[in-house]
Amino acid sequence: MGDMANNSVVYGGVKNSLKEANHDGDFGITLAAVRALMELRSTDALRKILESYGDVYGICTKLKTSPNEGLRGNPADLERREAVFGKNFIPPKKPKTFLQLVWEALQDVTLIILEIAAIVSLGLSFYQPPEGDNALCGEVSVGEEEGEGETGWIEGAAILLSVVCVVLVTAFNDWSKEKQFRGLQSRIEQEQKFTVIRGGQVIQIPVSDITVGDIAQVKYGDLLPADGILIQGNDLKIDESSLTGESDHVKKSLDKDPLLLSGTHVMEGSGRMVVTAVGVNSQTGIIFTLLGAGGEEEEKKDEKKKEKKNKKQDGAIENRNKAKAQDGEPMEMQPLKSEEGGDGDEKDKKKANLPKKEKSVLQGKLTKLAVQIGKAGLLMSAITVIILVLYFLIDTFWVQKRPWLAECTPIYIQYFVKFFIIGVTVLVVAVPEGLPLPVTISLAYSVNEMMKDNNLVRHLDACETMGNATAICSDKTGTLTMNRMAVVQAYINEKHYKKVPEPEPYPPNILSYLVTGISVNCAYTSKILPPEEEGGLPRIVGNKTECALLGPLLDLKQDYQDVRNEIPEEALYKVYTFQSVRKSMSTVLKNSDGSFRIFSKGASEIILKKCFKILSANGEAKVFRPRDRDDIVKTVIEPMASEGLRTICLAFRDFPAGEPEPEWDNENDIVTGLTCIAVVGIEDPGRPEVADAIKKCQRAGITVEVVTGDNINTARAIATKCGILHPGEDFLCLEGKDFNRRIRNEKGEIEQESIDKIWPKLRVLARSSPTDKHTLVKGIIDSTVSEQRQVVAVTGDGTNDGPALKKADGGFAMGIAGTDVAKEASDIILTDDNFTSIVKAVMWGRNVYDSISKFLQFQLTVNVVAVIVAFTGACITQDSPLKAVQMLWVNLIMDTLASLALATEPPTESLLLGKPYGRNKPLISRTMMKNILGHAFYQLVVVFTLLLAGEKFFDIDSGRNAPLHAPPSEHYTIVFNIFVLMQLFNEINARKIHGERNVFEGIFNNAIFCTIVLGTFVVQIIIVQFAGKPFSCSELSVEQWLWSIFLGMGTLLWGQLISTIPTSRLKFQKEVVHGTQKREIGEEELAEDVEEIVHAERELRRWQILWFRGLNRIQTQIRVVNAFRSSLYEGLEKPESRSSIHNFMTHPEFRIEDSEPHIPLIDDTDAEDDAPTKRNSSPPPSPNKNNNLVDSGIHLTIEMNKSATSSSPGSPLHSLETSL
């Protein structure tokens, strides 16, 4: 280190000459030489530097840069450097072209089948049998108009055209989705900045603007954006596992290993480096180039294999690429990482497994549901074709006794092709291949909108996961507080000052220790700069806590910069950088007489324990006994902490010149025997909006826990101010040590049972390390206390928070205070570091789930009706009332347009009124099932009435049993038109899935929805009135259109009728059918009242009086139920009372088979609640998510009272009884 300081001084003389020579001649080092140098490691690199350049300063000279003042920042010079050494940009993988996306969309099996059938139909339609054989070949319409009989080709052509439309829309969707993701990626890249020195000024520039010759400042937590050589370093340790696979941190120093490589993480320390290679010429870029070239060759070789795997892997690769590219790392780096060895494998396995994680819970559920429905659809379509073929053969050759004529064979084949097309049509509608599509659309929409709410989403699935969040482990500083720190109290000079005093009271030596200790023992990157505008606040650069300590020096009329100029960073002998584990920072100075002095600062309790002396009022050091320390803790530190202040102790120690030099690597022996200078209290005011956000979380069933490194009293005070803690509540506040003592056994191993006893009541974990945070997060996730697995979100800003951020279901990194390592490990970056943004993320997550449920409710209704109509119509009339082209149009409405309309609904505050859905919540709630079956019933009645009697009602010709190639009939056109309009109006019904009556509420807030509904209606008019034969439609009169609209609007009125049917009534009837009449009539009435209260509270605030009536009735019912508790318990003890048919109905058919816990497709949980095996488990969430009281209290009371569970303190039942 001493040599380094000397080098700096020597170099100072040539600094000015370099500035002048900055643009003269070429650089003294070539790009190839730099690349060759950076490929060497440790001693080899050091030897090469010494032999070829003398030292790192020689390299600086060759690169025409100053190690102290950096580049001058001249635009022409920067451009020349980019031209010679390249730009710091690694080009991403080329996006798929629109034609490639079209080709992928064409791979859909059902579309391929339809294309083949359409081509066969098209070919055969041009064959005409001899005139005389027409009668012998069966009913083939020749038509009265000229050319009428020759229009058979139109259906085949129209099917092909429709397939082209579907393919183009699908490809456009994929293209726009990819474009959105790339926009997000570029946004994240723009957010990435790095600190460099240019023209002697420390500035932050975008990573892409860094060029060779820049002097970059590296610090704890940074992700290095380019290759470089160390100029000066303090205790610098790098994690190079991303490049080498070695898990051990590599110590960097000028005399051992000075090379710093791009894509690696700074785990400890700080320093400066000269940038030597950027972009594709850096080590990361070289690997990317190799992988990119290899990848292209592989693509050419394995194109066929890849095509088969495309569907499975596309989304995963895209998400993985996005995740990697966001961090400035090449997309193709991932395979190399996961193939390397070492402990780094575990991290990389996590990343390599990301694609599995990216296929989110919801997407997985939808895919399974689509497969199951698809199987049913395949069966239905096969049966349809078989019935049609048999019907034709029996009718033609058995009943009519026609002979098989060779010349009629093409006609018969045309019939069979027609039947086949009908079967495929049933399959096309039945198979909801677009079911996972709304997830992608909704997530993409949400991700873009969440940016406006200060949530930068890195991993798509995190958006949906947050909707299920049950616990949030939040940092205190910056998240719950404003991170605007200032020293407001101090214990110094043996006095407790409630405000920072004038400099006069201090003895000169105390002031000297204070000024020097703070100036050199804070990172030199932490500065307080003058305000940009006159009268404004000073600008704070660097660490907020350190800037808070620098502030009082200015108040004391002392200039820390003078001290730093006198003792430059290069002159610091040894630095023990701040770590969340040690919770302190220490700096060693070497004096001119050969003695050493160490300054320490850190958490007051930790530093005070290492203090053996304290500076007295007259400035002399006196003995500091344990009881003196206890007095300071009680009289100074605890009062400060109880006011929410962070307490920091400042201390020093001298090492005399005559003694042997200490072993500096043995930190424990160095940082002890200190002399206390002062204890300061730093105020970090709480964010005023956080209390309301936490209230929303609690109402939404989310537990908020503070996990901080601060003093327990400080943490408790802030938690109380924010509303996390309430006086008189039975919650835990623990310190890290106490937490570990409680959860570990004698061998020091963590016991899950012990964690399960603590976490439900834990609200504050203070003086915690990142390991404690990881342990808590893992413990909550692995907990089996509740029936549903807990979904945990965690915030983090430090490098060591990485494991906790990765382990959590939703990892939030701080955008302002967070390190690059924390950001890389996170799922979402909070660009404003504010807790309220997490609550918005929860709201968006729940909105995704609701959007998918809306789409599901809509699509399944269409599926049920279309399949039954096509199947039954084909069997009865030997033809499908809905033609293939019409079905494709319906399919387009169902899949793509409805996805866009329903998956882009903006969220509302009401989403935070219910409990989390839980990972195992069925996709289809009872309310949704009621709506699906109810609307399907209405639509089927209307369609079949029109099908069988429509011609009499409208006084038109019947379209049933029409011959082959017959012109379109008005009859079937009306059926098609009314069917589509019913779907269109039902799309409005589908906007509400919790039984709300006002389906139009907020409809105009969603411009996309309004545009799609109106657009679909206009296209339907065009199809019916002008498309004619291609869509098998005949023009309709105004009266017929009015009837169509009236019957379509009937779904809205029918929806109101369905809403009046209580879901609880349906549940009760279902239980009667299953033979489980255990529910008291009073309880059933109570459930109805609760349902009414839900609607009243949600929609008509003036009916709040119902709450009071309802609560009175609930109180009465609780007493009644309590009275019958024991008798109910006896009744439940007999498992034989459950019939085998009930077990059969409630298990296999309603479950999705998977390695995960069984997730029923339909919410059938309430029918099982009475099972003795579930007597002691908490019931699943109510389908109605918009009412907190119902979910947390009333429903639980009914079920738990029946089950004879005791209302333990802290349980939902206990809290309800207490509130009543």
UniProtKB/Swiss-Prot annotation:
Residues 1118-1220 are annotated as: Required for basolateral membrane targeting. One of its GO terms (molecular function) is ATP binding. The active site is at D475. Residues 297-356, 1160-1220 are annotated as: Disordered. InterPro entries: ATP_Ca_trans_C (IPR022141), ATPase_P-typ_cation-transptr_C (IPR006068), ATPase_P-typ_cation-transptr_N (IPR004014), ATPase_P-typ_cyto_dom_N (IPR023299), ATPase_P-typ_P_site (IPR018303), ATPase_P-typ_TM_dom_sf (IPR023298), ATPase_P-typ_transduc_dom_A_sf (IPR008250), HAD-like_sf (IPR036412). Mg(2+) binds at D475, T477, D797. Gene3D superfamilies: Calcium-transporting ATPase, cytoplasmic domain N (3.40.1110.10), Calcium-transporting ATPase, cytoplasmic transduction domain A (2.70.150.10), Calcium-transporting ATPase, transmembrane domain (1.20.1110.10), HAD superfamily/HAD-like (3.40.50.1000). The chain crosses the membrane at residues 106-126, 155-175, 367-386, 419-439, 856-876, 883-903, 928-948, 972-991, 1006-1027, 1040-1060. Monomer. Dimer. Oligomer. Calmodulin binding. Interacts with PDZD11. Interacts with SLC35G1 and STIM1. Interacts with YWHAE; interacts with the monomeric and dimeric forms of the YWHAE but prefer the monomer form; this interaction inhibits calcium-transporting ATPase activity. Interacts with NPTN; this interaction stabilizes ATP2B1 and increases ATPase activity; this interaction controls T cell calcium homeostasis following T cell activation. Interacts with EPB41; regulates small intestinal calcium absorption through regulation of membrane expression of ATP2B1. This is Plasma membrane calcium-transporting ATPase 1. The lineage of its organism: Eukaryota, Metazoa, Chordata, Craniata, Vertebrata. The gene is ATP2B1.
